[in-house]
């Protein structure tokens, strides 16, 4: 099984840049991706523009957490030139970035348009710890008598029914009802899956309201990887009816996961603007 890759891109346009003096800063609005809050901070320091990516735990500031990630920040000019830097690091409450992202002269001469510039963050999460969600339904040992297989995901065990999962997912149908060795095993390990995302996915299948703007990235990624059509449909309905994500984000998700109804709604809204 191909690993689920937690990746996302977000942009922000900083305006009235000429007003920035030494020590002044701009902060982008926060965006929620994979249960974490993300924003970009830029600071003018003498003759440099500093640029940092920040991550925070939206659920609980009192719990120790970390996010290992690879990311880049990029600004581009109308002529096609760009400034971009790449970094690997661990977010644990402090921003990561550069105190010399681009010189102030270069920014004002090469990258400003109408006294503004747009910065893009491309992020790939490799590991998350300390992020939790409210449990809407338990799949722990208390469910043992209602299950026929234990799925080991990360350091958690989920007690579930093979036929139930097989009826919702072509992946589990092949795994449990096909000729794989897992069909006869009472405990199966699923590699490269986040247990928090898997918990949310199971809750969706059991009818719980587990989808929100914080969980949907992980649920949709996993549902697409495991071909769980019901969860994909529920995610699309949420994105159309309730999500607060930007039109840019919605269109990106529609294209990435072939969500044609969402794509149609987005295009219709754009055409009426």
Curated annotation (Swiss-Prot):
This is BTB and MATH domain-containing protein 15. GO terms for biological process: protein ubiquitination. Interacts with cul-3. The keyword Calcium does not apply. Residues 147-206 form the BTB domain. It holds the Pfam family BTB. CDD domains: BTB_POZ (cd01165), MATH (cd00121). Probable substrate-specific adapter of an E3 ubiquitin-protein ligase complex which mediates the ubiquitination and subsequent proteasomal degradation of target proteins. Keywords: Ubl conjugation pathway. It comes from Caenorhabditis elegans. Pathway: Protein modification; protein ubiquitination.
């Amino acid at each position: 099984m191909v690993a689920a890759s937690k990746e996302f891109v977000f942009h922000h346009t900083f305006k009235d840049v000429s007003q920035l003096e030494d020590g002044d800063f701009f902060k982008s609005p926060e965006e929620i991706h994979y249960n974490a809050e993300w924003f970009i901070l830029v600071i003018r320091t003498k003759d440099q523009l500093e640029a940092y990516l920040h991550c925070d735990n939206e659920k609980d500031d009192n719990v120790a957490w970390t996010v290992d990630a690879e990311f880049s920040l990029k600004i581009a000019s109308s002529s096609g030139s760009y400034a971009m830097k790449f970094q690997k690091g661990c977010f644990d409450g402090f921003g990561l970035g550069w105190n010399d992202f681009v010189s102030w002269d270069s920014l004002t001469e090469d990258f400003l348009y109408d006294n503004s510039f747009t910065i893009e963050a491309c992020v790939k999460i490799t590991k998350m710890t300390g992020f939790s969600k409210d449990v809407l339904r338990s799949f722990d040992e208390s469910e043992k008598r209602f299950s026929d297989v234990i799925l080991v995901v990360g350091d958690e065990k989920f007690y579930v029914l093979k036929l139930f999962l097989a009826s919702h997912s072509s992946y589990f149908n092949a795994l449990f009802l096909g000729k794989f060795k897992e069909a006869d095993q009472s405990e199966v390990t699923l590699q490269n899956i986040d247990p928090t995302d898997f918990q949310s996915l199971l809750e969706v299948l059991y009818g719980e309201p587990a989808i929100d703007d914080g969980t949907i990235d992980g649920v949709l990624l996993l549902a697409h990887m495991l071909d769980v059509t019901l969860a994909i449909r529920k995610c699309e309905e949420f994105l159309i009816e309730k999500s607060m994500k930007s039109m840019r984000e919605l269109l990106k998700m529609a294209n990435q996961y072939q969500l044609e109804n969402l794509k149609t709604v987005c295009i219709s809204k754009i055409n009426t603007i």
